Regions:
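RNA pseudouridine synthases
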Residues: 1-257
Length: 257
């Protein structure tokens, strides 16, 4: 019973209307139950829709404290709006479904993710199953004892390893960033630094391994695009013409990051 999860027995009895004069209270308890069931059905529908559109996340490693999950492109790492279904909700559902956590456990601990990826970026996200796992993994990312690398395919030929610098300003209304070579707008711009390593290349395309020295919103996508090497399939910062060519020829509809 959903209500019992949140109240002690004596409080629940009062709430549910165990006393003789319980008609009003009992009706309210029934309304709460109906409301909780309605919310649950809504969440399930949203989850099914996300899985249908993006694919289901895949747990690729698990021990007693952490999960490593392959997040599909199109899925949020964390919810942006109340009704979103993100990777955070998936982690809770996964641990409930596998019996690692119970609904009672979730009253005192909410599993979370230790790193985030943009919605349209696929890749590995670490999650904590326990407080210790969450703290240790988060600290490893923060202190850079654990390194993150991104793989992407960009337009044009890059044959030398390089580190590029610049400044980034985000427009929250359009959810888009602009890159500058020098600081702009009275100090509003944030410094960015991106390292890339060519893995292989042709005259028209390059497979890059990217290391974010700073971690700003949309940094890889916007920084590479500002240098004339936009990520293939990136509808926000890439070339519409080139994206259309790859979509028609190779059926690529997601960004190659």
């Amino acid at each position: 019973d959903v209500v019992k999860l949140f109240f002690a027995d004596d409080t629940y009895n009062k709430f549910a209307g165990v006393s003789e004069s319980n008609n009003i209270t009992d009706n309210r308890a029934n309304d709460v139950n109906k409301g909780q069931k309605s919310i649950s059905k809504t969440n399930e529908a949203i989850k099914r829709k996300v899985f249908k559109e993006c694919g289901k996340p895949e747990v690729i490693f698990e021990d007693d404290n952490i999960l490593l999950i392959n997040k599909p492109s199109g899925m949020l790492s964390q919810k942006a709006e109340q009704n979103d279904y993100s990777l955070v909700e998936y982690v809770s559902d996964y641990l409930l479904d596998t019996g690692y956590l119970s609904e009672k456990d979730l009253q005192t601990f909410h599993p979370g993710i230790c790193n985030r990826l943009d919605r349209n970026t696929s890749g590995i996200v670490a999650a904590g199953k326990t407080i210790m796992g969450l703290q240790n993994m988060s600290n490893a990312f923060k202190e850079r004892t654990l390194h993150k690398y991104y793989i992407c395919i960009v337009q044009g030929k890059l044959d030398k390893r390089a580190t590029i610098k610049g400044y980034l300003i985000k427009d929250n209304k359009s959810n888009k960033v602009s890159i500058y070579n020098k600081e702009e707008k009275n100090g509003e711009a944030l410094p960015i630094e991106t390292e890339y390593i060519p893995v292989c290349y042709t005259d028209k395309l390059t497979l890059l391994k990217v290391n974010l020295i700073t971690g700003r919103s949309h940094q890889i996508r916007a920084h590479l695009a500002s240098c004339g090497h936009a990520i293939i399939g990136d509808t926000k910062y890439g070339s519409r013409r080139i994206n259309e060519i790859f979509k028609k020829k190779y059926n690529i509809s997601n960004q190659m990051l």
